[in-house]
């Protein structure tokens, strides 16, 4: 479990963008993040509320297996990772892409 004084950036590794996640963000106010494998839903919820200053309605997590990759005769494997779907309450928004002028 992450201590309160530790940085919230340790739980949220990055935002995740795909066709499915963009559709969910437009229709259901759901955002997708890559998180630490051992993080809990309550930790994810509190870190997003503190970092983005929004109210979270629900958090769903999925554990994804790393893909097997082959380069010439060497077979390798990517790391397993955890994805979190974060549903925000009504009238709450996260601006992941800031305008660059």
Curated annotation (Swiss-Prot):
Keyword Ribosomal protein assigned: yes
Molecular function terms from GO: rRNA binding; structural constituent of ribosome
One Pfam family recorded for the sequence: Ribosomal_L23
BP GO terms, sorted: translation
Source species, domain of life: Bacteria
Disulfide bonds: none
Coiled-coil region list: none
InterPro entries: Nucleotide-bd_a/b_plait_sf (IPR012677), Ribosomal_uL23-like (IPR013025), Ribosomal_uL23/eL15/eS24_sf (IPR012678)
GO cellular component: a single term: ribonucleoprotein complex
Keywords from the named record: Ribonucleoprotein, Ribosomal protein, RNA-binding, rRNA-binding
Gene3D superfamilies assigned to the protein according to its UniProt record, in alphabetical order: 3.30.70.330
HAMAP family per record: Ribosomal_uL23_B
PANTHER family, A to Z: 50S RIBOSOMAL PROTEIN L23, RIBOSOMAL PROTEIN L23-RELATED
Family note: Belongs to the universal ribosomal protein uL23 family.
Function: One of the early assembly proteins it binds 23S rRNA. One of the proteins that surrounds the polypeptide exit tunnel on the outside of the ribosome. Forms the main docking site for trigger factor binding to the ribosome.
Subunit structure and binding partners: Part of the 50S ribosomal subunit. Contacts protein L29, and trigger factor when it is bound to the ribosome.
NCBIfam families registered for this protein in UniProt: PRK05738.1-3, PRK05738.2-4
Protein's name in the database: Large ribosomal subunit protein uL23
Gene, per the UniProt record: rplW
């Amino acid at each position: 479990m992450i201590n309160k004084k530790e940085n919230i950036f340790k739980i949220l590794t990055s935002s995740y963008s795909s066709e499915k996640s963009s559709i969910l963000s437009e229709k259901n106010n759901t955002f997708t993040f890559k998180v630490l494998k051992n993080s809990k839903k309550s930790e994810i919820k509190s870190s997003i509320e503190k970092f983005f200053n929004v109210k979270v309605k629900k958090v769903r997590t999925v554990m994804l297996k790393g893909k097997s990759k082959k380069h010439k005769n060497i077979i390798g494997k990517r790391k397993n990772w955890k994805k979190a779907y974060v549903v925000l309450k009504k009238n709450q928004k996260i601006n992941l892409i800031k305008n660059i002028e």
